[in-house]
């Protein structure tokens, strides 16, 4: 559960956006970063840790197994990066079809987006 340095990498319910109002407030803040496959919407929160929500539209990933794969990749990347991310509410939203994308390309895109987040 924890790495040798002692960083907690669990993905608990406290690290997720659950309610529609939480998602709406992040979208209403209107700050976003765009990558090759994903958009990362963000909003500072008053907590000590980052929280994540994932949106994958059927229009961009028609098959359920592809949508689930994209969500799993996003959650796993967030879980591994959460301790170094600023205290923001984040929404990872797919904005380009992933039919030809590899898992490595999706991971790299997310890693670059998380790295570009303002550290406020």
Swiss-Prot record:
NCBIfam families: rnpA. GO terms for molecular function: 3'-tRNA processing endoribonuclease activity; ribonuclease P activity; tRNA binding. Coiled coil: none annotated. Its EC number is 3.1.26.5. Consists of a catalytic RNA component (M1 or rnpB) and a protein subunit. It catalyses: Endonucleolytic cleavage of RNA, removing 5'-extranucleotides from tRNA precursor. The keyword GTP-binding does not apply. It is an enzyme of class 3 (hydrolase). Disulfide bonds: none annotated. GO terms for biological process: tRNA 5'-leader removal. Keywords: Endonuclease, Hydrolase, Nuclease, RNA-binding, tRNA processing. Gene3D superfamilies: 3.30.230.10. The lineage of its organism: Bacteria, Pseudomonadati, Pseudomonadota, Betaproteobacteria, Rhodocyclales. It comes from the Bacteria. RNaseP catalyzes the removal of the 5'-leader sequence from pre-tRNA to produce the mature 5'-terminus. It can also cleave other RNA substrates such as 4.5S RNA. The protein component plays an auxiliary but essential role in vivo by binding to the 5'-leader sequence and broadening the substrate specificity of the ribozyme. This is Ribonuclease P protein component. The keyword Nuclease applies. GO terms for cellular component: ribonuclease P complex. HAMAP family: RNase_P (MF_00227).
């Amino acid at each position: 559960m924890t790495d040798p340095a002692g960083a907690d990498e669990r993905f608990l319910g406290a690290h997720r956006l659950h309610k529609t109002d939480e998602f709406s407030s992040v979208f209403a803040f209107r700050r976003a970063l765009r990558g090759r496959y994903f958009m990362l919407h963000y909003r500072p929160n008053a907590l000590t840790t980052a929280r994540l929500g994932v949106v994958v539209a059927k229009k961009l990933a028609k098959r359920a197994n592809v949508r689930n794969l994209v969500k799993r990749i996003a959650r796993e990347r967030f879980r591994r990066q959460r301790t170094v991310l600023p205290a923001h509410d984040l929404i990872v939203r797919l904005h380009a079809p992933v039919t030809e994308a590899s898992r490595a390309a999706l991971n790299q895109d997310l890693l670059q987006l998380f790295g570009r987040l303002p550290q406020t």
